[in-house]
Structures are given as structure tokens and as C-alpha cells.
């Protein structure tokens, strides 16, 4: 079964998309065409959206699902005339909160994502810059400023995990690739020994690692199953020998990996 889902907002659309994606993920038997439409902030834009929604309904043979965070009632009323099934996120959640808190909401567009109102903005930018500057062991002299240092074999998911934690949580995460030479020495590289309390290991199934490496360097020793199996086995032995917590990234999303790391290390997110 196929359905179209629209994430519509008169702001960035981040809230509508984030919540909508989470809800749609619960319906694994349905294939969704997902369309984000931010800054629908005029009646003219709203009427154009109605046409898009109706076209999708005709094409799919079923009503599109609409997740909206629209503040303007006029725009919401126009969209309500479409052939879509509307889920008004603000009305669904703010009304019960207003009742519980005995206070009226400001109904401000993009409140949580506004630079001028968001003290987390610079924390996020600094964390992303830190992750990029300290990626793949490129430099180690700033490890004293790191909240976390991810270690593991090449191409096991360290970089995307560091960047996600920076963007989502403001965590300053560095990463360091463990090489065959490191494993043969049977100990941590000297650059990491001083920061052992910040280390967390990532590992991966050898067949998955071989597939990823083959996309980068096909038919190379680096990408061979035998090499991948050796590196994964030895790095896991190193983690156990050094008492470094680690998880296998094969079957987890970057969101799940990041959350598990923060819980196991007891690191508090900087973005509140």
C-alpha cells in the first residue's frame, strides 16, 4: 500500500517532520511518499498546497496524511478544504498542556528553532565544528575538551555518530580509527591512553563492514572479508582487554547508537 504524507508548517517544518516521521515509522507495511513543505505562510501558498494534496489523493487513490504546525487559522482553514487527513500537532498537544499548566500558549512560529530565542544555537555550531576538526584522528591535541571519543575500525560509523551527537545534543565528540598496527601492539595508541575515561567503542559485523569498504575500495585487501573479520575480532578483543564499553552498530540507526552511548557513558546533553 502506498500513501503520501505532507509535513506542512508556516515555519521551518522541523517539528511537523520530526513527529510525523516518528508516527509513520510505526506502519511498516505502508510505503509513504514524504513531502516537507515549510513556510506555507500566505493564503496563496495554502491554496497551492491544496492543489498538491488533491493531486496526490487522486494519484494514490487515498487521502494524503497531513501533519501540520500551522499557527495561522486562516491558512489552516484553507488546507482543511483539501482531500487530505489533517493532524494538527499544535492543537493536539498544546490544548491539553494549556489546561494542565493553566496558561495560554504563545503559538509562536518556529519558537524552538529560532536563533534569536535559542541559546543552544552556538553550542550546536561549536559541537559540529569540534566533530569536523577532530574527525578520523586528524588531530588529538584537543581531546581534553572532548565529551566523548569514539574508537573503532575504519568505516564502522564513527563519523556520522559524532556529527549526529553534535547536531542533536551539542556533544563534543571526536573519533579515532584503530588500525592493524594498533591491534598488533595489543594496546591503545599513546594518543588515547590519557583519555581512556572518554573512550567508547563501535564495532560492526564483518560482512557489513566488507560491503561498506567495497563501495570505497572495491576488490582491495582493505575491503576483503578476511581483513574485515580480522580487524573486528581484534578490536573487540582490545576493547575487552582495556575495559572499554562498546556496541555493535550493524543493526542500529545513528539515533539509537547515539542514545545508547550517552546512556552508557552517563554524558549529559548540552542542548536542553
Curated annotation (Swiss-Prot):
InterPro entries registered for this protein in UniProt:
Kinase-pyrophosphorylase (IPR005177), PSRP (IPR026530)
Catalytic activity reads: [pyruvate, water dikinase] + ADP = [pyruvate, water dikinase]-phosphate + AMP + H(+); [pyruvate, water dikinase]-phosphate + phosphate + H(+) = [pyruvate, water dikinase] + diphosphate
Tell me the residue numbers annotated for binding ADP: 152-159
Give the E.C. number(s).
Answer: 2.7.11.33, 2.7.4.28
Is the keyword Cytoplasm assigned to this protein? Answer: no
Q: What class of enzyme is it?
A: transferase
Keywords, sorted A to Z: Kinase, Nucleotide-binding, Serine/threonine-protein kinase, Transferase
Task: Specify whether Kinase is a keyword of the entry.
Answer: yes
- Annotated signal sequence is none
GO MF terms listed in the record are: ADP binding; ATP binding; phosphotransferase activity, phosphate group as acceptor; protein serine/threonine kinase activity
Q: Which PANTHER family match?
A: PYRUVATE, PHOSPHATE DIKINASE REGULATORY PROTEIN 1, CHLOROPLASTIC
Task: Kindly give the NCBIfam families that the UniProt entry links to this protein.
Answer: PRK05339.1
The family annotation for this protein states: Belongs to the pyruvate, phosphate/water dikinase regulatory protein family. PSRP subfamily.
Functionally, this protein is described as follows:
Bifunctional serine/threonine kinase and phosphorylase involved in the regulation of the phosphoenolpyruvate synthase (PEPS) by catalyzing its phosphorylation/dephosphorylation.
Q: What is this protein called?
A: Putative phosphoenolpyruvate synthase regulatory protein
Species name: Stutzerimonas stutzeri (strain A1501) (Pseudomonas stutzeri)
